[in-house]
Amino acid sequence: ERLVVLPLYPQYAAATTATVCDEVYRVLMGMRWQPSLQIIPHYESEPLYISALSNSLNLKIKELNWKPDLVVASYHGIPQKYFDKGDPYHCYCHKTTRLLTENFKDTEIKTTFQSRFGPEAWLKPYTDKTLEELPKQGKKNILVICPGFSSDCVETLEEISIQGKES
């Protein structure tokens, strides 16, 4: 009788969250019986989400046998033109990082964007370029987190775990 849709993208973007909603509506259009529908559009700043991120990051830092010079919060990128047209994703990513930073006053956290492809401009700064530049700035102990997904994303795991180390 009730359908709650929670897209696994904490930060709303038309290309992701709205696409999930479009598919839900498409399926519902073919149904005679309609459930009560609630869609959680974004939760980038929800206290429970920020707390879960903070706890996860804190545990990871404690597991390390080194102190990070910097934590890179790498979000999946979107084309710059989406932001220029008013997509709030970029703002939501920075909001998540800002709220996370409030729980780690002694740790610098930087927002970056990954997974760009094609010739057009994407949101910056780019994760791969940032990871290449940080050692030149004396930051060699870098921890990368990916708060743009609520569960592991194979593309992101490959990109950050393998390609990120190569940078």
Name each model-derived stretch.
Residues 1-167:
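Extended amphipathic ligand-handling, pore-lining, and cofactor/metal-binding catalytic surfaces
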